């Protein structure tokens, strides 16, 4: 089940971020999320904006993501490619799982696709699992964008077929 994140979920979500950071480091992606990233402040901002979600299995929070309306300033400039559309879009950010449930990425993508006609997502060049999940969900590689700290990310977009 996917639902909006509650303030009472913050400890569980922060623990999921810890697990996700450890997974990334163990799988060759040591720099995408430095310690303390995403922060509790970022999570609180996502909750306040109404865009933070959790995935529950048997009443336990096992994953989280932000699903927010665009525009997102890190997508204003794209290199080594282009967005397939300039139509309004929603973004997926801060996707993380505790690794205990299968099909979480597919459920998150399906949730977002039910609510938007155009989606954008980005991930670190070393985050091969997220790149693979994005492609499997029908996203197309769009190019390279730069996040707020100036580091590059591989960007993907998805458009509902007419």
Predicted feature locations:
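Conserved beta-hairpin
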Residues: 49-65
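Conserved GNAT-fold acetyl-CoA-binding loop/helix
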Residues: 21-41
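A short beta-loop-alpha structural element at the N-terminal edge
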Residues: 1-15
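Conserved acyl-donor/pantetheine-binding loop and adjacent beta-alpha core of acyl/acetyltransferases
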Residues: 66-100
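Conserved GNAT acetyl-CoA-binding A-motif
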Residues: 114-126
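Conserved active-site alpha-helix within GNAT-family acetyltransferase domains
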Residues: 106, 126-144, 151
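C-terminal "cap" of GNAT-fold acetyltransferases
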Residues: 84, 147-162
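Conserved acetyl-CoA-binding loop-helix of GNAT-fold acetyltransferases
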Residues: 97-114, 132-136
